[in-house]
From Swiss-Prot:
Positions annotated as active site in the UniProt record: 150
Reactions accelerated catalytically: N-acetyl-L-glutamate 5-semialdehyde + phosphate + NADP(+) = N-acetyl-L-glutamyl 5-phosphate + NADPH + H(+)
Protein name: N-acetyl-gamma-glutamyl-phosphate reductase
Pfam family, one: Semialdhyde_dh
GO molecular function annotation: N-acetyl-gamma-glutamyl-phosphate reductase activity; NAD binding; NADP+ binding
Species the sequence originates in: Pseudomonas aeruginosa (strain UCBPP-PA14)
One BP term from GO: L-arginine biosynthetic process
The gene coding this protein: argC
Entry keywords, A to Z: Amino-acid biosynthesis, Arginine biosynthesis, Cytoplasm, NADP, Oxidoreductase
Length: 344
């Protein structure tokens, strides 16, 4: 049985991680931390977990207790894992970080986007970017895994086949992405209030979103060179979901794009390439660790449109983190993650 610790268990990614781990036959949550809710029972805060974690309480972070776990997940704001990850690694504990702390390979680039110095630059060289569809073999040997963000997951999975094959003009890619409000976190913010977010949609961070360098980094690796990416995120009046509409110029009209995508993801348990002409919906992935993709070439022209949808809290966060844990410990990748999406 894998002994699990969770740092920061009161946010949406934390409770989603608890929900998924409750269904995992080879993992047990030993420690969950929250400074603000120390002493509160998990099941009292989240009644949906009653019967699964009735005796588990939030506690103040303690490196000794966390270090006794086999793996510790960080479901925290950026900057928190910087301070604790090194001590846990020294204790022999593996770390899976759901925050942005170790996603970017360049400490200075991270500092520019997050407005503070990187707190653990010495760990960046060994941090493995936890996108299993790209880095599965590296994940198996990792001590420190950086779980990709939600927008980066949907965008990279949608564009990687075109870039790996050298088909797309990498200098002019567009990612037009929509997110549910849970992507903004559980903290109280005016923009997340029902009366502000309901019955409305808006673009934000058009000048530059923190996920932009992460997406660009992954696409550069896929293409083997520089990329030019325009990324525009939008907030939509739904709780869960990412819908990415991706545009790429592909001059070669003889390529069977459907076959290309199907071949690339044929052995991927959590990527579903839908039949030609499909339009994947966010509701089709709600609660599931899956990315559904459809590829189109409108009017047979040079512009290819890829539609990519995920649940931002599952394949875009906690589910992908659990997928990484399964790989890391040599388990079936699908363990605890094979349930169907929720409909309606």
């Amino acid at each position: 049985m894998i002994k699990v610790g969770i740092v920061g268990g009161t946010g949406y990614t934390g409770v989603e991680l608890l929900r998924l781990l409750a269904q995992h036959p080879q993992a047990r949550v030993e420690v969950i931390t929250s400074r603000s809710e120390a002493g509160v029972k998990v099941a009292d805060m989240y009644p949906n977990l009653r019967g699964h974690y009735d005796d588990l309480q939030f506690s103040v972070p303690d490196v000794q207790r966390l270090g006794a776990c086999d793996v510790v997940f960080f479901a925290t704001p950026h900057g928190v894992a910087h301070a604790l990850a090194g001590e846990l690694l020294d204790a022999g504990t593996r770390v899976i970080d759901l925050s942005a702390d170790f996603r970017l390979a360049d400490a200075e680039e991270w500092a520019r986007w997050y407005g503070q110095p990187h707190g653990a630059p010495a760990l960046l060289d060994e941090a493995v970017y936890g996108l299993p569809e790209v880095n599965r073999e590296k994940i198996r040997q990792a001590r420190l895994i950086a779980v990709p963000g939600c927008y980066p997951t949907a965008t990279q999975l949608g564009l990687i086949p075109l870039l790996e094959a050298g088909l797309a003009d990498a200098s002019r890619l567009i990612a037009d992405c929509k997110s549910g409000v849970s992507g903004a976190g559980r903290g109280a913010k005016v923009g997340s209030l029902f009366c502000e977010a309901g019955e409305s949609m808006m673009a934000y961070a058009v000048k530059g979103h923190r996920h932009l360098p992460e997406i660009s980094q992954g696409l550069c690796r896929a293409s083997g060179g520089d990329v030019g990416l325009t990324f525009v995120p939008h907030l939509t009046p739904m709780i869960r979901g990412i819908h990415a509409t991706l545009y790429a110029h592909v001059a070669d009209r003889s390529v069977d794009l459907q076959a290309l995508f199907e071949k690339r993801y044929a052995d991927e348990p959590f990527v579903d390439v839908m039949p030609a002409g499909s339009h994947p919906e966010t509701r089709s992935v709600r609660g599931a660790n899956v990315c559904r993709i459809a590829v189109h070439r409108p009017q047979g022209g040079d512009l290819v449109v890829v539609l990519s949808v995920i649940d931002n809290l599952v394949k875009g966060a906690s589910g992908q983190a659990l997928q990484n844990m399964n790989i890391l410990f040599g388990l079936d990748e699908r363990l605890g993650l094979s349930h169907a999406a929720l409909l309606p």
